[in-house]
């Protein structure tokens, strides 16, 4: 077919008629331009107000309810009651608006939360309008606010003052504390939360007795801390102050009351009682045998004595031993004569059999990790 045998092109008048018919059909289908919520420029229009809804914001409704209250404060239930009595729209519609009222009360600084008095019946706190926010609406009209109110200092508002009952309770608590701690002088409780308790003197407690550390010792002894005024036993007294701050033991001719402990790195003569430190010291290379007149060997931070076994005897068939302080007592544990070496292992002759048995059962070489072939 050629172009001449085809249908003729439509006339402009026919195209205009078709466009008008299509627009009428769309309008008859209920899709007008206003129903889409868009204007001629394509921008979305503001949602229209619901029929019968008051033109006041939730902040204005709350401020209106508080302003009409006799005491200029209301509970949350009182605010609900005022709004539903004054505006029937909120009485007939669902209660979703109550959530908005609660949110505006807690999120806006222009509303103050006042605790309920102790003797007042009912429940819930009171809500009041901040005194500095009374002029936030222009010319007393609740239709428009000047600007958002921001609270500067919480401690400057009288709404946060404690009531008389709370003040009396605080005074009673302060009196009770003064009776328990006579030396304490607590200041009056500040009326606002977050304030600093100034002027409080803590009770004067007796200081604990100081721990005795000799002057020449590079570090404190790891066995005991001695108080010079109170020796541990009648045989042991405060450490003598030797020349140059020496912390050595007293000589054999000194009285027993001048015997003291030997701190780290100190050596000296044996005390007057030869059986006061009858215990063996097992060092890294074995036990160190020491005679009755030899000096005491002391490792860093530990007390040691001669390597002789605990002195004692038998009296009437009962074996007696000498304890750490040189006092005689029945020896219930006579077999435990060895002590521990610095490595945490048992030393002495009594521990040799123990180590021999465990060395056979648990070899310490590499063969313990190789299975038998």
Curated annotation (Swiss-Prot):
Keywords (alphabetical) are: Congenital hypothyroidism, Disease variant, DNA-binding, Nucleus, Phosphoprotein, Transcription, Transcription regulation
What spans are recorded as compositionally biased (Basic residues)? 41-50
| Cysteines joined through disulfide linkages | none
InterPro entries linked to this entry: Fork_head_dom, FOX_domain-containing, TF_fork_head_CS_1, TF_fork_head_CS_2, WH-like_DNA-bd_sf, WH_DNA-bd_sf
One Pfam family recorded for the sequence: Forkhead
Q: What does this protein do?
A: Transcription factor that binds consensus sites on a variety of gene promoters and activate their transcription. Involved in proper palate formation, most probably through the expression of MSX1 and TGFB3 genes which are direct targets of this transcription factor. Also implicated in thyroid gland morphogenesis. May indirectly play a role in cell growth and migration through the regulation of WNT5A expression.
Name of the molecule in the record: Forkhead box protein E1
